[in-house]
Amino acid sequence: MRFRVKLILLGCVAGLNASPAVAQPDCPHGALDTRYCDRDGDMVADAPTDAKQFIDPDTLIFSYTPIEDPAVYASVWENFITRLEILTGKKVKFFQVQSNAAQFEALRSGRLHVTSTNTGGVPVAVNCTGFVPFAMMSSPDTPYASHTEIIVTNQSEIRAVQDLRGRTIAFTSPTSNSGYKTPIYLLEKDFGLKVDVDYKSTFSGKHDNSILGVVNGDYEAAAVADVVLAPMAARKVFDPAQIRSIYRSGSFPTTGYGYAHNLAPALVAKIRQAFLTYQIAADANLSPEFPAQTKFIPISYKQDWQVVRQVDAATGVKYDCK
């Protein structure tokens, strides 16, 4: 059960200015690409030691992880963006990123400054792009957690996980934790079902594509994140009575929010302040999308993403940062 995720950088994203990092040969890298140093052992890229390598752009580029049509989230994040502009004193532009590949490319080349990345994409972004995750959403009592669900249509003959043998399961993308890596790992570990041996696989590109593909009868079954499934149902994108969940995994950390490692320290401090003092529950745009979440809390990639890295290791994931 091994596969390789290759990050290939294809060129520029229109309207964004690049400022790529250069190789850092004389420092500890850990699992990071050689462009980045990890002297303190926290598993994320250190800030540059040369002040000339810091960037302090007049306009900050912000994006949200591409789990659905990015246009949906432009208005969702509008109030937060205003808050970010006030605290940083900079104009903030929402970048409608279409894919993880485009997001990682923009991060690595310096054209994206503040963003969120889906659970499974965080290790890719950390190791290959210099992404520094520092926050995630939380309810008053517990951090926002993600689960993998395997869904089928309500009329499907598939009633239990073992019924997936010989069927085709739609996954989202190879970098997705809840949409690919975790389900293929757990299906083999707990049920003896090996991907592309005991069942066939296909990729939809995004969680919303997988969900709507099941609803519309295009896919027999799909592995998706509940943190995408529930908001889509709440927005009445589909009727939840049309589907059934036949499996739900244990919890994983969810979307990680962070910044490019080479942003100026004073700017980083203001970005962190904007997130960690923001009241999600008071935001009329953001709170309906994340109704149980009230705030952002600090995270540690080294500690909080350990379980995700363990799944990657167990499934033989290797990342080629090119």
Regions found by a protein language model. Name each.
Residues 104-163:
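Acidic, polar ligand-binding/catalytic clefts
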Residues 62-85, 120, 143-211, 227, ...:
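Bilobed "Venus flytrap"/periplasmic-binding protein-like clamshell domains
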Residues 119-130, 183, 188-189, 213-216, ...:
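A ligand-binding cleft/hinge motif common to bilobed small-molecule-binding domains
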Residues 21-102, 285-322:
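N-terminal hydrophobic or amphipathic helices and topogenic motifs
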Residues 91-98, 194-206, 244-247:
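Short beta-strand-to-loop elements that line the ligand-binding cleft
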Residues 65-66, 140-149, 176-178, 237-311:
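Periplasmic-binding protein-like
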Residues 101-115, 128-129, 162, 207-227:
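Short helices/loops that flank or line small-molecule/ion binding pockets
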